[in-house]
C-alpha cells in the first residue's frame, strides 16, 4: 500500500520480539501528537482478514499485549488468524512523552488518540475492526463510542477487561484526600506507578487529576465540556463482551456490571472470571489477561467469541 497519501502514517520499521515479527509505525493525531502503532500480522497466512485493536490501560504499554519474549494475547490472536494492532497512547511506551507530558489528559487520549488509531487501521486495512481494552483502555474506548468520537460503523464488536468507573479507590470519596492528591500531582507532574509496583509506565498528572474528578465524592464521568459518557452508552449497539474478575480490587465486577447494563447492545455478554463460573482460579486485575491460566482458558474463550462474530 502506498502510504504517501496518508501523511499521518509512517512507513513501517520491522522488529523482532522473541521471534515474533512486528511492524512499528508512527501515526499523528489531529492535535499533532505522535503515537506508536505496532502490528502483528496473522501467522502462516492463516488470515481471518479482521483487524483487532488492543488498547492498554493506565501505567501500561505495548508489553502488556506482547512481551519482549514474544508472548502475550496479541501474539495469540495473530496465531489464531487475526490482524493485530497494538497502539500506545500518548506518553506511553514508544509514544513520546514530550515537554508537555504532565498536561496530557484522559480526554486527550479519548478524543484524539483513539480516533487517530481508528483512522490509521482502517486506512491500511479498509476493514472494520474488533476493539479490545483492558482497564482504563476499555473505559476510554466506551467513552469515545458514547460521544461519537469513534465511528461506530468501523467497529465490529468490543471487549473490555476490568473496565469501570464506579467502585474502587474509595479514599477518593473523602474530599480532603482528593484535593490533596490533585495538588501533589500538579506539583509532581506525574504519578510514579513503577516505583509503587503498579505498572511499567508513569502516568501524567493531567490524566490522574481527571480520573480523580470522575471518581471523587459527587464526581461525574463527563468530558471537559460536561457531556456525560454514561448517557451515550445506550447508543453502543455493536456486540459487546464484558470480562470482570472475582479478585479484581482495582475494578471490581459490580462496577463492570453497572456499565454493561447501560450498553444498548442486544448481543452482549457479561463474564466473571472465577471458580464459580468454571475457571481454574479467581482472577485479578492483571492476571485476567496476563497469566499462564489466562493463556490456557481466557484467551481461547475470547478468540472463540470473536470468531463467532465474523
Where in the sequence are the language-model features?
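Short, surface-exposed "cap/lid" segments of acyl-processing enzymes
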Residues: 42-94
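Short alpha-helix in the alpha/beta-hydrolase fold that links the catalytic acid
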Residues: 252-262, 272
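Acidic catalytic loop of the alpha/beta-hydrolase fold
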Residues: 247-251
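N-terminal cap/lid segment of alpha/beta-hydrolase-fold proteins
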Residues: 6-44
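Alpha/beta-hydrolase-fold enzymes
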Residues: 122-127, 131-132, 136-224
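Alpha/beta-hydrolase active-site loop
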Residues: 103-123
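Short beta-strand/loop motif that positions the catalytic acidic residue
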Residues: 236, 242-244
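Catalytic active-site module of serine/aspartate enzymes centered on a nucleophile-bearing elbow/loop
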Residues: 269-310
